[in-house]
Amino acid sequence: MEGSEFSSTTSTSRPELFDFEGISMVHYFTDDWENVQNFHARPDDILIATYPKAGTTWVSYILDLLYFGNTAPERQTSIPIYFRVPFLEAVLPKIPTGVELANNLSTTPRLIKTHLPVQLVPKSFWEQNCKVVYIARNAKDNVVSYFHFERMTQAQPEPGDWNSYLQSFMDGKKVFGPWYDHVCGYWEKKKTYSNLHYMFFEDMVENTDREVENLCSFLGLSTPKEEREKITKITHFDAMKQNKMTNYSTIPVMDFSVSQFMRKGKVSDWKNHFTVAQNEQFDKHYKEKMKNTTLKFRTQI
């Protein structure tokens, strides 16, 4: 089935947040829930998982190039990334559901994206021992990016002002639930599930070549160095921002006059948004929320 049309592009058409399976959600990511949970993963599927605005599209594009850049180069110039790497739980206007897109993929492996927290990932991915690539981004930059994203997309609730948005992020009242639980959930899963590769957005920005090499090692790919360097260049943020097949300018739910889908792609942009008081409050809250995990982030590089 296809997602319903938006009635308008005004704030009145934005969905309401509601509690669902223990997290906050909007209907665009729950309307096809039964089919999502019953999704039949294959052993060679690769699941790309992130909290929203943590580098999903970047890593999706890298993986697409690693597997199909040479064998099917026309994909890169003619098929938008959201068709090449379906968003599994999404039911958005004017395009098939994520499950339909995933089931219709003719590629091997199938690259599939999700923002679901680890406990809501369809069981078949674990049962089939699929490779899972998780990308995490420091909370301060993540909340800034998510704020600007929610300003420009009609598939998310009205974000309100920055101060109230930051508070709701700290309270975990964001689509796909609390950032803290999301990043820690996959970090804990990694301890018992060896086919999970945990990446950091900050490491990607600092040294993309190295991170692509590590990704290849995890995937068992013997991609030549010159090929990896080429991929690093093609997937540079500025290049992707100009690329209509990766910048989401062809999807109907986003208003680029408000903000770009791919806005800055930098580390430490949070310093341009947080006041001193907000930063102190956030740090105190963060320390409490993250006190029981070994997971560490960098807020600058």
Residue ranges and their predicted role:
Residues 117, 204, 236:
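Short, internal active-site loops enriched in acidic
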Residues 57-69, 199-223, 231, 239:
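PAPS/PAP-binding and catalytic site of the sulfotransferase fold
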Residues 1-199, 245-301:
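PAPS-dependent sulfotransferase catalytic domain
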Residues 143, 166, 205, 212-213, ...:
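Generic structural signal for individual residues within well-ordered alpha-helical segments
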Residues 228-234:
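Acidic/histidine-enriched alpha-helical segments
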Residues 74, 223-228:
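Acidic/polar loop patches that form or flank catalytic/metal-binding clefts of enzymes
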Residues 218, 222, 234, 285-292:
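Hydrophobic alpha-helical segments
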